[in-house]
């Protein structure tokens, strides 16, 4: 080998916070008698009714503690306070459910009809930890998005440290998934049998140049552990754009993802990740609930 030969350089994005290995997502409805008042409080600072105000302070205190200790990964309401999405980082599903049951809003039936799933985030791949990141990067090398190297050649890794910043707008899309067909495709791939071209197109749609990950449209995306759902949180400017991205996914076009729901979502917990449009209101409300505000 030439003495002037230099190993290839591969850039690796390293975030300040890695997505936990296990996440449990909870969707719940908000009591229609409380939602409009909460909406006005966060939109214009209007005072809550006395009973709801005290309950809300206890709810915020409960969630703030869980956000600070890492038990809540991300949590918050829809834009109009009709439903919530809470994502817990706990050892198991039952632990996550116990934390929700202890929420003052849940105990007072302000939250109800809760549905649960274990959630595995696949993209953005650079926000995930091992072994998920290695699996996704292996897929990217297999389809030519990342380079492959001959035996004996190892790249020099150039690290790019990034701070993950919550965007101004987030839109949740929860779609049902055809777990049977997805499992069959995965089994065919493992057995080196022919796979549908739309599987590769789906990977390119998410991971390739101009795809949703590379363009920054994926805040966090991936399947439920049982493959019955796909939960995608889009970082885009409008719900129409989120809908278009979902509809452009080859898995949607081929019927593997279907019946999607959409809503704008605000992160309230943990406070350090709060959506920009809610940060000032949360700072004020959290401060009101403390003898010595943290902010």
Where would I find each of the regions flagged by the language model?
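Conserved, structured core segments of small domains
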Residues: 2-295
